[in-house]
Design a protein with these regions (language model features):
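Long, highly charged low-complexity segments
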Residues: 250-308
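Metal-dependent nuclease catalytic cores that hydrolyze phosphodiester bonds in DNA/RNA
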Residues: 1-111, 239-275
Length: 499
């Protein structure tokens, strides 16, 4: 017999229940089915904690409660602090109607207590009002007179110069009216959640709510019946249209009705999946290749971003380049240049100095996903205007190697709807693989670079640096091989030998 489910709810459980009752039920009854957060998601959680702690400094006289003290202890301590005249309490803890709320910052204002909810986002989003609404419900229900509710978030226009300016780093939005407008629904919402929790696993099919507003960590369980390369893998097809097919009984690509509207690129993908035929537009690819002139550079950046800027001329969540790989092909020979910034200092100026020198011989510079590299270059030109002329010269020579694949001038079913280099490379050059690399994608590279700054052991630092260089080098070597393969496929056999 299944043991009774606890009907006690935390703020995060309440907002989970708003997204999906089944997700809440699984959390309470089958937590072992929950996907563990990957390193990237955990890093974002940690960043949110960092921002929350930093925001407490907006109220320097505040008293902060420790989560490790336990919920019951913190509830009683909160009441004691209020009774003793405390003006600011961080992580103030309340319980009402069997719901727990821990307020990031509770401050005594001129007209009563003020709630401050801190987010590591750079804007106030509608979904955040669900957080403030349930907090207000609990705190007011616990007998506290709440006069105003605020949402504290990062200001993405803040540019660090010298010491952090916390008042400029954070933006404080008054969300009192929005918070109050949702109070009328909370009692009913809680009743519906508790009714769902009291029964067996809710019979709720997958839907857009599996990814909106957040990707659910029970998705691997609920989506286990979805095969590889299903209708959900059709690139650029809107989510609601995918689910209209799914709810109509269509899951496999071959079952898509003939009158269902698809773009030309979507049709190419579906046809390739069904027939196994390779799509190769020789004319378009030849025209693309004709615009590439030797010496040819193959360039890739790695970047990091952080909510709280560490360096001058840096903004919250700005993508900061810390590494590049540049292969140069000229007259049948290939040479390689690379850069990896030293941790603990702003890498951008050193990055630019070496890149401008290394890329000087290139007449064409191939990148994969041109908007990303160009945006980073333009940002560095803005932040370091002394390099602007050289940066403009690089931008003028950039050609996007992604173009033939994004346009579906080349497509095979193993690409599964994607034109990411991680799918294109194995399709064209199956013997070149990231599988044996310690670092296999950009997010891993960013996390490794962040870890590098915290390490003391030289041997471990050396291993990570080597792994970073190997990964970035593989990206640009892969670009070389893709370019080579496209050339060889557009010319008669035996006519061309690049390497």
């Amino acid at each position: 017999m299944r043991r009774p489910t606890s009907l006690f709810l935390s703020k995060s459980q309440f907002t989970r229940g708003l997204q999906c009752h089944k997700s809440l039920w699984l959390l309470k009854n089958r937590p072992e089915l929950r996907a563990e957060p990957d390193a990237g998601l955990q890093a974002r959680f940690d960043a949110g904690t960092e921002v929350g702690i930093l925001a407490q400094q907006l109220f320097p006289a505040g008293v902060a409660l420790e989560y490790s003290s336990g919920i019951s202890k913190n509830i009683s301590t909160t009441q004691e602090l209020i009774a003793s005249g405390a003006q600011t309490i961080c992580e103030a803890t309340f319980r009402h109607d069997n719901v727990l709320a821990m307020v990031d910052i509770l401050h005594k204002g001129p007209d009563g207590w003020e709630l401050y909810e801190v987010k590591s986002s750079t804007e106030t989003k509608d979904i955040f009002i669900n957080d403030t609404a349930i907090q207000y419900y609990v705190v007011a229900g616990a007998g506290i007179s709440v006069s105003r509710v605020f949402l504290v978030h990062l200001n993405n226009q803040y540019i660090r110069m010298g010491e952090l300016d916390l008042k400029a780093l954070f933006t404080i939005d008054d969300v009192t009216a929005l918070t109050l407008s949702r109070q009328v629904d909370i009692t009913q919402q809680l009743a519906e959640m508790r009714q769902a929790l009291a029964g067996s696993e809710p019979s709720i099919d997958i839907g857009t709510y599996c990814n909106d507003p957040y990707e659910c960590d029970f998705k691997p369980y609920c989506w286990q019946h979805i095969p590889e390369c299903s209708i959900f893998d059709i690139a650029n097809l809107r989510s609601n249209r995918k689910f209209s097919l799914y709810y109509g009984g269509v899951l496999q690509l071959e079952d898509i009705p003939s009158d269902f509207s698809l773009s030309d690129n979507m049709k190419i993908q579906v046809e390739a999946e069904l027939t196994g035929r390779e799509v190769f537009n020789t004319q378009n690819i030849r025209a693309f290749l004709a615009a590439i002139t030797e010496p040819v550079g193959f360039l890739d950046f790695e970047t990091f971003m952080e909510p709280v800027p560490s360096f001058d001329r840096q903004r919250p969540y700005q993508q900061v380049p810390f590494q590049y790989s540049l292969h140069i092909y000229e007259k049948g020979k290939l040479r390689h240049h690379e850069f990896l910034g030293e941790t603990g200092r702003d890498p951008r100026q050193d990055f630019l100095e070496k890149l401008l020198e290394d890329s000087q011989p290139c007449r064409t510079i191939l990148v994969y996903n041109q908007p990303f590299e160009i945006a980073r270059l333009q940002e560095m030109a803005r932040d370091f205007p002394g390099f602007a002329e050289g940066i403009d010269s690089i931008i003028a020579r950039i050609v996007d190697l992604m173009e033939p694949f994004r346009n579906r001038d080349y497509y095979v079913k193993t690409m599964c709807g994607s034109y990411s280099i991680k799918y294109v490379l194995p399709a064209l050059v199956p013997d070149l693989s990231y599988d044996n690399l310690a670092i296999a994608d950009g997010e891993m590279a960013m996390l490794a670079y962040a870890r590098l700054a915290k390490l003391q052991e030289d041997e471990e630092k050396k291993k990570i640096k080597t792994a970073l260089l190997e990964y970035c080098r593989m990206d640009t070597l892969g670009m070389v091989k893709i370019w080579q393969k496209l050339i060889s496929m557009t010319q008669p056999k035996g006519q061309l030998s690049l390497f």
